[in-house]
Every structure is written in structure tokens, then in C-alpha cells.
Amino acid sequence: MATAEIEEIPALLKPGQTVAGLDLGTKTIGLAVSDLGLSFAHPRPVIKRVKFTIDAQVLLKALETDKVGVIVIGLPMNMDGTAGPRVQATRAFVRTMQPLTDLPFVFWDERLSTVAAERALIGMDVSRGKRADRIDSAAAAFILQGALDRLHMMRRNDYDAG
């Protein structure tokens, strides 16, 4: 499967699978993984980018280890809602990954995710040096948590309507 919509995630997951969040940078790939209840995003170590084949291999191994069934990837939109300069690179990354995995990708607007992640790390009194190492995975967790919160709201609305 190529890409999916956020609303499709529950139907795509098999029992025991999690959801991953990715923050794609030029030097690193931030990674976060949900719990089985799809309530909380947990940052994982960043993946240092080398070249695509190595990056993909490391990423796919991490996704397999965490029993990931769906990947939510941040789409770097501009504040006015238009596609930012990194949107094309993100879409190209997904297109290049698709032949390597059956996992579906869900694009998620990541506006201000890095800013929010940095503020959270500052709030936790993480030193500047350690923040640089953790920012991309913290941003991935922020992206994934936004998607998980949306899923939770959808379930709640379905429950209230039923």
C-alpha cells in the first residue's frame, strides 16, 4: 500500500502493531513509536542519514523491531498552508521507500513540530548539546502524538454519535 489517510489507520493495524512517526531531516530521521493502545508517542533514537539505501535499511529494521503497522510522516507545510520547500523531498522519500515495504504512509502536517519539541526539551531543562541530539525524535513524537490525538477524537466522536 502506498499512502493512506489518518481515518484508515485503525483498519490497517493488525493486533499487536504500533504506529511510527517520522520527522525527515537532511541529516537525521527522527523516529517515534506509539504504545499498543495508540495513546502515547515515545521517541526513539534518531537515525543518522548516510545514503538512502543505508537509511532505509536502518529505518526498516527499527520499524520491524517495534512491530510498526503504519508510518505517519511529517509533511513540512508553510504557515499559510502551502507546500514548504521540503514537501517535495518528503514525498520523494516516501515514493522511494514504497517498493521496500508494504507499510502504508500517512502524511501529517508538521507545522511548528520542531518548535514545540524544542520548547518541551527546554522546559525539561535539557542542555543545548543534548537538545541537538534529541530534537528530531522529539519532533517525530510531537508529529505522532498529533496523529494519535486525532485518532482518539475520531473514536470519541464515533462513540458520541452512536
Curated annotation (Swiss-Prot):
Task: Keyword check for Cell membrane, yes or no.
Answer: no
Q: What GO terms fall under cellular component here?
A: cytosol
The enzyme's main class, written as a single word, is hydrolase
- EC no. given is 3.1.-.-
- Protein's cellular compartments: Cytoplasm
The alphabetized UniProt keywords are:
Cytoplasm, Hydrolase, Nuclease, Ribosome biogenesis
Q: What's the superkingdom here?
A: Bacteria
CDD domains per the UniProt record, alphabetical: YqgF
Q: Which NCBIfam families match?
A: RNAse_H_YqgF (TIGR00250)
Q: Outline what the protein does.
A: Could be a nuclease involved in processing of the 5'-end of pre-16S rRNA.
Please give the name of this protein.
Answer: Putative pre-16S rRNA nuclease
Organism for this UniProt entry:
Brucella canis (strain ATCC 23365 / NCTC 10854 / RM-666)
